[in-house]
Each structure stands twice: as structure tokens, then as C-alpha cells.
Amino acid sequence: MPSNSETKGRISADKGSKIKRSNSHAEDSIRVQPHSIEAEEGLLAACLIDGGQEVITACIESHITAECFFKRQHQVIFESILALYEQGSPVDEIVLHDHLCKSGTEDESGGIATIYHIQGRIETPAHANYYAKIVHEKYLLRRLIRTSREATEACYEQQEDISVFIDKIEEEIHNIS
């Protein structure tokens, strides 16, 4: 049988670990999710250079969607870039701004000042593939975080057969890539 001092030590250790977990959870809830504003702006800028057709095509082929962007303004801008591309319209800062105004999303995008800021980020689309890779990787990390949190919550509420439950979670994680 453990002595009273051993028991106190274990309780203290347990309390300490609970506090650590609690602090870790609190820290996790206030942490900023993975993203790279610089890569997002670089990729958007590359889409605006020389009509952006090659870069936009590469984005589509790489499964870059508006959801891949962390910043809401960037999502709105990329949605408009894709819409212009699908219409066969040229993509530059003036046509993009006009599209944002006509679609009622100018304010949400940050307007012409944001477009000019983004446009000034790079001078050549030469590194667009690298920017796209960074944007996509950060998006996948955010999806993994979200899926992991949802899986953790589901573990507390798990009611079904454990092997079926684990299979579902494995499938959700596998679907991220």
C-alpha cells in the first residue's frame, strides 16, 4: 500500500498533468491556424500578371480553390479570378475590380487598395507553383486540425461499434489529401 506522501505526490503529479492538458487545450483554442499570407498574396499577384491564364490553369490543376486561402479577402478575390477565367475574360487588377463591384463583393475583398497591395507583392509569376504549394499545404493542415477536433469530439459521443467508428475517422483523415 502506498504511503501517504507517495499518494500526495501522485495526486500532485496528476493535478499538474491535468493543468498542463488544460493549458495546452486553452493555448490550442487561441492559436492561429497554419497559413501564409505572403504565399497567398504572391499566388494572387501571379494570377494578375500577364492575364494570369497559365497560373490560374495551374491552380485549377493543383486543386487550389478559394477555400484554400486563409484570409477571407483572398478567398473572395480568388473566387472572382476563377469566375473571370471561366468566362474567358482577361484577368488584371482593373477587370478584377470591376467584377468585384458588379458581384457586390468589393467591400468583402478589401477593394482596389487590397488589389493594388497584392499586385505589388511580386514582379514575375516565376515562383507561382511554390506559392500554390505553400497555400495548399497550409490548407491541408487546417483541414487536418478541423478533422482532428471533430474526431476528438466524436470520441466523447461515440455510440456505434468501435471498429466502424475508427474506420469512419480513418476515412475522413484519408480524404484530406
What are the roles of these predicted feature ranges?
Residues G120-S177:
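Interdomain "pre-motor" coupling segment immediately N-terminal to P-loop NTPase/helicase cores
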Residues P2-Y139:
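Noncatalytic partner-interaction/assembly domains of nucleic-acid and motor enzyme complexes
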